[in-house]
């Protein structure tokens, strides 16, 4: 468990130091965390969780279709390069999530707006999968 937490901190460190992560919509996006040790429906899954305040149901300016383009971008340009730096098996699936506020993984948070997309990794690219 300690090794997983250390790896998550190492992977998250550059994003936190850089602050905002560029996405096509231009909305402000920051990394909340990366979760490696929870299995998904496709087997080993890496979850990259981001904070994107502009998706908020009340007062947000980014709709789901725009956010979906941002999630595709985050998978291909942010998550994939970090998968290549891990030790051990490569995840079969990447889940990208956006939330308008920080949320605890696995805890129902009705006040949060959250979007999720799942991707298979094929030929070095993220391929959207129905979730």
Task: Mark where each language-model region is.
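Sec-dependent N-terminal signal peptides
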Residues: 3-12
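Sec/Tat signal peptide C-region and signal peptidase I cleavage site
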Residues: 13-17
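Extracytoplasmic
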Residues: 18, 26, 41-45, 70, ...
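Short N-terminal segments immediately surrounding and downstream of signal-peptide cleavage
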Residues: 18-36
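Short, compositionally biased low-complexity segments
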Residues: 40-55
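Mature extracytoplasmic domains of secretory-pathway proteins
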Residues: 51-93
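Polar/charged, Gly/Pro-rich intrinsically disordered segments
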Residues: 88-131
């Amino acid at each position: 468990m300690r090794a997983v937490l250390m790896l998550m901190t190492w992977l998250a460190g550059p994003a936190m130091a850089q602050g905002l992560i560029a996405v096509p919509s231009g909305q402000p996006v920051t990394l909340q965390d990366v979760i490696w040790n929870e299995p998904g429906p496709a087997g080993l899954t890496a979850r990259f969780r981001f904070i994107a305040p502009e998706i908020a149901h009340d007062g947000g300016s980014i709709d789901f279709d725009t956010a979906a383009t941002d999630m595709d971008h985050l998978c291909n340009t942010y998550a994939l390069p970090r998968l290549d730096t891990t030790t051990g098996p490569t995840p079969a699936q990447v889940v990208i999530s956006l939330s308008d506020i920080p949320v605890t993984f696995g805890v129902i948070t009705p006040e949060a707006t959250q979007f999720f997309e799942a991707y298979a990794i094929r030929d070095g690219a993220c391929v959207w999968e129905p979730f």
